[in-house]
Amino acid sequence: MSHGKRTDMLPEIAAAVGFLSSLLRTRGCVSEQRLKVFSRALQDALTDHYKHHWFPEKPSKGSGYRCIRINHKMDPIISKVASQIGLSQPQLHRLLPSELTLWVDPYEVSYRIGEDGSICVLYEEAPVAASYGLLTCKNQMMLGRSSPSKNYVMAVSS
């Protein structure tokens, strides 16, 4: 799919916000009203956080800065937004995976649950001039794999 030069980050942020909101929804305990407030606040927070770190012409540039990470320690952006809807740190840790990496890059949003989990793509759009030679944070992590990663749809049951 080709497209004109796009500088907005709305589709990517919407994919990331939708994914995180669905994790909270699936695990229960959060009302739809609170989820809507969470989603709007997270969209605003990520848009603000990424505004000087979004480079559609070089999608891998700034990838580490845009990465949302939970590694037994909650990502500060998620933590701040969750506190706005009254979710405490212990509640967040119960509702979200203890190991989650969410990459929000121009033209692609992907995630991995667990340190050795498969990387799954949530959103993908082909850039105008694809530069396949660049190593993104995600691609660097995949270099050591002996077999290709398998993409699975994650389902969480309560």
Curated annotation (Swiss-Prot):
The modification Phosphoserine is found at residues 147, 149. It comes from Mus musculus. One of its GO terms (molecular function) is transcription corepressor activity. Interacts with PRKCABP. Interacts with CNOT7 and CNOT8; indicative for an association with the CCR4-NOT complex. Interacts with PIN1, inducing mitochondrial depolarization. This is Protein BTG2. Belongs to the BTG family. Anti-proliferative protein; the function is mediated by association with deadenylase subunits of the CCR4-NOT complex. Activates mRNA deadenylation in a CNOT6 and CNOT7-dependent manner. In vitro can inhibit deadenylase activity of CNOT7 and CNOT8. Involved in cell cycle regulation. Could be involved in the growth arrest and differentiation of the neuronal precursors. Modulates transcription regulation mediated by ESR1. Involved in mitochondrial depolarization and neurite outgrowth. GO terms for biological process: anterior/posterior pattern specification; associative learning; cellular response to phorbol 13-acetate 12-myristate; central nervous system neuron development; dentate gyrus development; DNA damage response; negative regulation of apoptotic process; negative regulation of cell population proliferation. Keywords: Phosphoprotein, Transcription, Transcription regulation. It comes from the Eukaryota.
